[in-house]
């Protein structure tokens, strides 16, 4: 997510 995890790139 845009402000959920540092790996938001993998989420969306």
UniProtKB/Swiss-Prot annotation:
Keyword match Hydrolase: no
4-carboxyglutamate: residues bearing it: 4, 8
Name of the protein in its database record: Conorfamide-Sr2
Organism, scientific name: Conus spurius
GO molecular function: toxin activity
Tissues with expression: Expressed by the venom duct.
GO CC field: extracellular region
Described purpose of this protein according to its UniProt entry: In contrast to other conorfamides, this peptide does not show activity on human and mouse sensory neuron-specific G-protein coupled receptors MRGPRX1. In vivo, it causes hyperactivity when injected intracranially into mice, and when injected into the foot of the fresh water snail P.paludosa. It also causes paralysis when injected into the foot of the limpet P.opea. Has no effect when injected below the rear part of the dorsal fin of the fish L.reticulatus.
Record's keyword annotation contains Secreted: yes
Key words of the record: Amidation, Gamma-carboxyglutamic acid, Neurotoxin, Secreted, Toxin
Subcellular location as annotated: Secreted
UniProt record, GO biological process: venom-mediated paralysis in another organism
Recorded superkingdom: Eukaryota
Residue list for modification Isoleucine amide: 12
Sequence similarity: Belongs to the FARP (FMRFamide related peptide) family.
Additional facts recorded: The mature peptide does not contain cysteine residue.
